[in-house]
Amino acid sequence: MPDIIIQPLNIADREWISQFMLEHWGSNKVVSRGVVYYPQDLPGFVATDESEKVGLVTYDITGSYCEIVTIDSVRPFSGVGTALIEAVKNIALQSGCKRLWLITTNDNMNALRFYQKRGFEIVAIHRNALDISRKLKPEIPLIGNEGIPLRDEIELEMILNDTASQ
């Protein structure tokens, strides 16, 4: 299998990102901690295998914090997600960020396992946060993975420093 190539997103990727978000997230709008994001307008990286796009990550840097807003791999367990996180981690370090963080939902057990295995720690559970998010994005379902009610945002972080080897 050929190597996965990680490249920065460019303006030509915007339409693809919008379509990808609609197909995989049901909307091209993302809500995190009460903030609405449009991933097609954010910086990020795309993972390709030959000419096929197999992964996407978008992020937002505010001050010394870098938030991973979206991350997706169409090939689970292939190293795509890990490579995308490493790309964002590197850009965060180059930008002087001290914290890499993200939000997932209480139903997303696969994400919780994935992030913790890569050095992220759970730092907060924002109870009933999705009630607020649904006011900004009504299409967020009430029931998530495995029939679990979607209620809470779970915040994970990785503290960054120049010698970080996580």
Q: At which residue positions do the language-model features occur?
A:
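Conserved N-terminal entry element of GNAT/NAT acetyltransferase domains
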Residues: 1-12, 154, 158-166
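Conserved acyl-donor/pantetheine-binding loop and adjacent beta-alpha core of acyl/acetyltransferases
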Residues: 28, 32-39, 56-58, 76, ...
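Conserved acetyl-CoA-binding loop-helix of GNAT-fold acetyltransferases
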Residues: 78-90, 113-117
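Conserved beta-strand-loop-alpha-helix junction that forms the acyl-donor binding cleft
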Residues: 102-111, 127-135
